[in-house]
Each structure stands twice: as C-alpha cells, then as structure tokens.
C-alpha cells in the first residue's frame, strides 16, 4: 500500500441508486458565472438562477461529492437533481426550510 492510496472495487461506482431524481432547465440571468456545489440545496441556490424552485425543493445536484456545476452568464443548461437523503432535514443556505422537508 502506498500512503494516501485509495483502493476501490473493480468496475463503476453507482451514485444515488434508487433515489428519486428529476431533470430541470436552469438559466443564469446574472452577468457573472455562478457555481453550485454537489450538496447545496438546489432550491436555495443563487437567485439569479431561474428555474422551478418549488419543484427543486428537497433536491441537490446529482453529481459526485465535492464537485460543482458552473452556470455561465446567460447560459441555459439542463441538470439532473437527486432527492436529499438521510433524515431529509435542511438547515442554513438561505434559511427557507430550516427543518424537516414536507
């Protein structure tokens, strides 16, 4: 073993298997790039991102942990979201949930 080496099983690692997902279109209406991280509650992302926030409540980006998606100014892109797991409680961000999801 090499210090810091990560040993994984052969094959592909599947993320978020069995969790509900949804695909939404997002537009950055700001004049600056906006980046959203993998575990950020997407409905509370930067207000310059235009999308169906009610639909996105309780979801985050369906990307590997530690990654982010960058939205360039004026850019429209489609992203896949995955339901927040665990106890499905959200605190912080813009303070719009502050507890259990309904």
From Swiss-Prot:
Q: Name one Pfam family in it.
A: Urease_beta
EC numbers on record = 3.5.1.5
CC terms in the record's Gene Ontology section: urease complex
- Entry keywords, A to Z: Cytoplasm, Hydrolase
Q: In which pathway does it act?
A: Nitrogen metabolism; urea degradation; CO(2) and NH(3) from urea (urease route): step 1/1
Looking at the keywords, is Flavoprotein present? no
Quote the CDD domains the UniProt record gives. Answer: Urease_beta
Cellular localisation: Cytoplasm
What is one GO biological process annotated to this record? urea catabolic process
Annotated GO MF terms: urease activity
The catalytic activity, as recorded, is: urea + 2 H2O + H(+) = hydrogencarbonate + 2 NH4(+)
Where it mainly occurs, coarsely classed, is: cytoplasm
Q: Which domain of life is it from?
A: Bacteria
| The UniProt record lists the keyword Lipid metabolism | no
Regions that span the bilayer:
none
Family designation: Belongs to the urease beta subunit family.
Quaternary form? Heterotrimer of UreA (gamma), UreB (beta) and UreC (alpha) subunits. Three heterotrimers associate to form the active enzyme.
Write down what this protein is called: Urease subunit beta
Q: Which gene encodes it?
A: ureB
